[in-house]
Design a protein with these regions (language model features):
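Hydrophobic alpha-helical transmembrane segments in multi-pass integral membrane proteins
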Residues: 81-84, 145-156
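Long, contiguous internal "core" modules enriched in hydrophobic/ aromatic residues
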Residues: 1-127, 143, 202-208
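Central hydrophobic cores of alpha-helical transmembrane segments
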Residues: 132-143
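Hydrophobic alpha-helical segments of multi-pass membrane transport proteins
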Residues: 115-122, 147-151, 180-192
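Extracellular/periplasmic helix-loop-helix junctions in multi-pass membrane proteins
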Residues: 23, 93-100, 126-133, 152-172
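Extramembrane terminal tails and long inter-domain/linker segments of multi-pass membrane proteins
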Residues: 157-167, 177-222
């Protein structure tokens, strides 16, 4: 529900400004591409969170289960890559991608991080290791972030510059965003410290002393 509502709406928002957005990104398929990308990056974020949490709380990391998640993401990434390429070809914008402009170079970097690197990692034996899974997740997540930033900043930079203006988030926008991330992180620490989410399961911390050590560490942070 969240991806379908939020991501589709975010993609639809830019359909109303095709003359302001660079043609590389200005497509009628944008809402669907936003939704699809959120579907396959979701497992990437889950993989990063799972590895960090299990390492942090001294729990066993199920690499086989995580590899299954990468398989799902890799298939959707391949579909996204094909759809994106077909859209560029049909709109006659493929040449702009390889024109060595800022927009073209940023788009290539976006696709490499979002699709190419994760798919290659998944196909290699390295993709079944903890390190490979972590790189898979980080690449996909960074690629999605760059995708959104390219639409907001890179894709509209030429139009804004033509009007003699510029855009950069205000101090309050930056602080409020960082604050939301910190609030979510502190809430996560509080929940894991005060509710039995991780301990008491085979493969978790083996002794009460380990649990107390984790508790003291988190208390120091909070």
């Amino acid at each position: 529900t969240v991806p379908l509502g939020h991501q589709a709406s975010l993609g639809s928002l830019y359909l109303g400004m095709p003359a302001k957005l660079d043609p590389i990104w200005a497509t009628q398929m944008m809402p669907w591409l936003f939704v699809l990308s959120s579907f396959f990056v979701g497992p990437c974020v889950a993989i990063i969170e799972y590895i960090w949490t299990n390492s942090r709380y001294n729990m066993k990391i199920d690499t086989e289960m995580l590899y299954g998640l990468t398989r799902i993401s890799a298939v959707l990434m391949a579909v996204y890559f094909v759809l994106k390429g077909a859209d560029l070809v049909m709109r006659g914008q493929l040449g702009n991608v390889f024109s060595f402009t800022l927009e073209g170079n940023m788009f290539i970097l976006e696709m490499v991080l979002l699709c190419v690197v994760p798919i290659i990692i998944h196909l290699l034996p390295f993709g079944k290791t903890q390190g490979g899974l972590l790189v898979f997740g980080l690449s996909g997540m960074c690629g999605l972030i760059l995708t959104r930033l390219n639409v907001v900043f890179t894709g509209m930079s030429a139009h804004i510059a033509s009007l003699g203006g510029s855009f950069f988030p205000s101090f309050m926008e930056i602080v409020s965003t960082i604050g939301l991330f910190c609030l979510a992180f502190l809430a996560f620490l509080y929940i894991t410290e005060n509710f039995p989410f991780f301990y008491g399961v085979p493969g978790d911390a083996d002794s009460k002393a380990e649990v107390e050590t984790e508790h003291e560490f988190n208390q120091a942070i909070m």
